[in-house]
Structure formats: C-alpha cells, structure tokens
A protein has these predicted regions:
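Acidic/histidine-rich catalytic cores of soluble enzymes
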Residues: 49
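Non-globular targeting/processing and membrane-anchoring segments
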Residues: 1-46, 54, 58-63, 67-71, ...
Length: 142
C-alpha cells in the first residue's frame, strides 16, 4: 500500500499551545479521518505525523510552528500559496507566527478544506492506472 504522509509541527510548551495551533489540530484531524476513508479503497494509506516543538526550538524560528508538510513538501507548495506571519499570543511570547496566504486571504489556522485539497493534489502523484481499477460505488466522496 502506498503512503500519503502528512506531517505537522507546532509549539507545545507545558501542554499549552496557541489558539491557532489548537484550531489547526482540530482541522487536520477532521481532514485525516476523511482522507483515510476515501483513500483506503484505492490502496493509499494516510499517515499523520504530529510533532511537538519546545519553546527553545520555537524561539529560534517561530515560523516553523503550525507548519504542514504533505509528502515532504510544504502545504503552500501544493496550494500555490505563500507563507506569512502575524502576531500570535502570550503562549507564543507574542512572536509573529506562521500564516498561509492564498487568493488574497490570510489563514492563521489551516482549514480542513485546504488540507484536503493539498492531499488530493499529492495523492494524484501516487495514483497509478492500476489503482483506479476499483468497483463502481466503492469510493464514497465526502
């Protein structure tokens, strides 16, 4: 079975994280569950790799917190988006944290729809004609 790997890292200091990372975590979990269900029948296993950053690591480069990679490429590359930054909160020591800029909109937390879209684009690279030979009605699209 081929693997579609989603890697996400965020600041976690004494079990505390910022609101935007907390929201992204909820969104990535929803996307992960849907993607697992959709890709399993065509032989693609979805793997979610969550990583924690200490405050010391965060302080060296706050813009790598709340970052998602899909198949070792930043989500921004899949979506043709840009990364940005904006002031966050006291958990982050008021650092400027990562945002995504896409089609004139800035996202402080990453919505489920963008995660799914990027994963669909990545999955297209994994799909071979043989994988598409599934019985009609097997795939349930969300």
């Amino acid at each position: 079975m081929k693997k579609l790997i989603i890697r996400w890292q965020r600041l976690l200091d004494n079990n505390k994280t910022c609101p935007r990372c907390r929201k992204t975590e909820k969104e990535i979990e929803k996307a992960y569950k849907k993607l697992k269900e959709v890709f399993s029948p065509i032989g693609i296993e979805v793997v979610l790799d969550k990583r924690e950053m200490s405050m010391d690591v965060f302080k060296t480069n706050p813009l790598v917190s709340n970052q998602i990679w899909i198949m070792d490429k930043p989500i921004e590359e899949w979506l043709n988006a840009n990364s940005g930054k904006s002031r966050c909160c006291d958990v982050c020591d008021d650092e400027e944290c990562r945002t995504i800029e896409l089609s004139g909109k800035t996202y402080e937390s990453i919505p489920e729809a963008l995660i799914i879209k990027a994963c669909l684009l990545a999955a297209a690279d994994l799909i071979s004609p043989k994988l598409l030979n599934v019985p009609r009605g097997t795939l349930k699209i969300f």
